[in-house]
Amino acid sequence: MELFFMNKQNHIFTMTDGHKIAATTYFPGNEIIGHIHILHGMGEHQRRYEGFANYLCDLGYLVTSHDHRGHGNTAEENGGLYGYFADKDGFERVVQDVHEVLQQIRVHHGMYPLTLFGHSMGSFIARRYAQLYSTELDRVICCGTGATTPLHVIGNNLAKVLSRVKGPKTPSIIMNKLSFSSFNKKIPDVVTIFDWLCTDEQEVQKYIEDKQCGFIATNQFFADLTSGFIKIVKPKEIKKIRADLPILLISGSDDPVGENGKGVYKVADQYKQAGMKDVTVSLFEGMRHEIINERHKQQVYDVVTRWMNNEKI
C-alpha cells in the first residue's frame, strides 16, 4: 500500500535524449538539513521506499527518488517496455539520468548537502555516479551491493549474443535464470522464488503482487547491467572518486547479492586500495537482501542515522 504524504510532489522530467523520467520529492515538515536521493533496484520502483523516505523526512532531510528507465512509472511514461535501458550504452545512460534528474531537482528545491542512497542495482549505479561526479556528493550509501565476479564477464558475453540473436527487447529467461536461480539455495523452507529478498513473508508477498515488480528484464538490459558491473571495478575508474568521500556499505548477512557479506567486504577493499579514506561496512545479522524491508529494519535506519551524524556505528 502506498503511503500518503501531505508533503509529496510527483514530477516528470525530460532527459536530454527526450526520455521521460518519473520522480518524486518528499518534503520534511521542518528545516531542511540535507538532501538524500534514493536509487531503487532492479525489477522494482521508487514507491517501495516511501516508508524509508518518511523516516528520513522526519529527521529533516529533503528526500527525492526516481524510477529508472524500464522501471515503474518511467516505463509507463515511455511506452510500457519494462526491463530495458537503451539501445546502446544503457548503463551509462541510466547514470546520466541520475545526474540530469538531480540537476533539475536542485534547481527547483535548492542546493543542500547531497547523499546518494542506492539499493542493489541502484547501488551499482551509485558507485558509477560517484566515479563521475564525486565532487557533487557529500556522502554515498550502497545498500545490498556486491562484488563483480568472472561470472559477470561470462554473463555479459552471453547477454550480448542473446541480444543479437533473439533481439535486444526480448525478455531474457536464460539470463534471468542464471542471475537469480541460486539465490534461495541457503534459505530453509523456501516458499516462493523471491524468499531471498526478505525474511518478512508479507513484504515478499507484496513484491509478488506488485505488477511493477519481479518482471523478467530484456537481453539488452542484462548486457548493459553486466557491462556496468565490469566497468565500475576497474581501478582507474575507482580512482576517479575523491579520496575523502564518505561511503557506507550496508547489507544483510544472508544477502546472496553480497555473497553473505564476502562480496561487500571485497568492494570495501577495492575502495581502500584505491586510496579512499572513509569507507564503512555494516552487516545486519540474519537479514537478507532488502534490509530496509526487514522486520527489524529500525536497526538499519538507526545505523544510517548515526553514520549520517558522524557517530560511531
How would you name each of these model-derived features?
Residues A53-L81:
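Conserved alpha/beta-hydrolase
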Residues A126-Q212:
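Alpha/beta-hydrolase-fold enzymes
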Residues F4-N30:
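N-terminal cap/lid segment of alpha/beta-hydrolase-fold proteins
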Residues A274-I313:
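Catalytic active-site module of serine/aspartate enzymes centered on a nucleophile-bearing elbow/loop
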Residues F85-R106:
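Alpha/beta-hydrolase active-site loop
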Residues L249-S251:
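Short beta-strand/loop motif that positions the catalytic acidic residue
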Residues H109-S120:
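Alpha/beta-hydrolase fold nucleophile elbow
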Residues H40-E44, S120, S253-D254:
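Active-site glycine-rich loops that stabilize anionic/oxyanionic intermediates
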